[in-house]
A protein has these predicted regions:
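Hydrophobic alpha-helical scaffolding
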Residues: 14, 18, 36, 71, ...
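Structured core elements
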Residues: 36, 178-180, 282
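Conformationally flexible catalytic loops at phosphate/diphosphate-handling active centers
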Residues: 62, 66, 177-270
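Conserved thiamine diphosphate
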Residues: 133-183, 195, 207
Length: 286
């Protein structure tokens, strides 16, 4: 998927050896103002990196440090994300497996309120009769009904290249994203990859969408009611109204993939020109 177009000049980027978790954290830090975290294998290094960078005074693309809030559990971290988004702060979290399942109640609220969050997930087996820390997609598949869009990557370079698409499409499309990749096989695989410069990430950011999101935040100067009770005469109509955003989302995702392609000379996209396509959702072994 990340082949290079011959007719596009590739932008020069710094190279660095890192794993998929670090690549996701690098992009997430750029677009995040608040991170609600709780550690769980194999996603913990993402939250740890963001916490370390914040403590060191690193700035995001908005010129501020990320405020990191560690809670008592993943359920608390998801509640932090929901509350922070409601007050107009771009908020992210990092999790996997049972940790992601604990976030599902808040995910319904975040998606239902059309709040632009990104959950970075290093996908891991959901524990059943026994604990298992290795990779499958049972955790992210359990979230399909929540209303979150899903974007997947297969290696650390794709994590670096495509994570911005999740953040930017969430902002413009008003649909939250799960950005996921295989636990351990991608999250902990160290490769020499090309990394984004924050100035390039800032250039792609739709500041008008950021401003619209902040204006929609809870504010005592212009109070609004949220989370109210609705009867059946209006609940269904209001719930269906968000379908327009989901119908428009593929075009928004493709728009930002094209922006990435313009900068990198890559050929990321949602559709293939081939007439017969086999699809897999896993890390690459070659």
């Amino acid at each position: 998927m990340n082949k290079f177009k011959e007719d596009i000049t590739k932008m020069a980027r710094a190279k660095q050896s890192m794993d998929g978790n670090t690549a996701a954290a690098h992009v997430a830090y750029a677009y995040t103002e608040v991170a609600g975290i709780y550690p769980i294998t194999p996603s913990s290094p993402m939250a740890d990196s963001v916490d370390q960078w914040s403590a060191a005074g690193q700035k995001n693309i908005f010129g501020s440090k990320v405020k990191v809030v560690e809670m008592e559990s993943e359920a608390g971290a998801a509640g932090t994300v929901h509350g922070s988004l409601a007050t107009g702060a771009l908020t992210t979290t990092f999790t996997a497996s049972q940790g992601l399942l604990l976030m599902i109640p808040n995910m319904y609220k975040i998606a239902g309120e059309m709040l632009p969050s990104v959950f970075h997930v290093s996908a891991r087996t959901v524990s059943t009769h026994a604990l298992n820390i290795f990779g499958d997609h049972s955790d992210v598949y359990a979230c399909r009904q929540t209303g979150f869009a899903m974007l997947a990557e297969t290696n650390p370079q794709e994590v670096m290249d495509l994570s911005p698409v999740a953040h930017l499409a969430a902002l413009e499309g008003k649909v939250p994203f799960i950005n996921f990749f295989d636990g351990f096989r991608t999250s902990h695989e160290i490769q020499k990859i090309e990394k984004w410069d924050y100035e390039d990430l800032k250039e792609m950011c739709p500041m008008d969408a950021v401003e619209a999101f902040r204006k929609h935040a809870l504010n005592p100067e212009h109070p609004t009611a949220r989370g109210s009770h609705e009867n059946g005469d209006v609940f269904f109509q209001h719930r269906e109204a968000c379908n327009k955003a989901y119908d428009a989302l593929p075009a928004v995702v493709e728009k930002y993939m094209n922006k990435v392609n313009e900068k990198l000379g890559t050929d990321y996209g949602l559709r293939s020109e081939e007439r017969r396509v086999g699809k897999e959702c896993r890390s690459r072994w070659s």
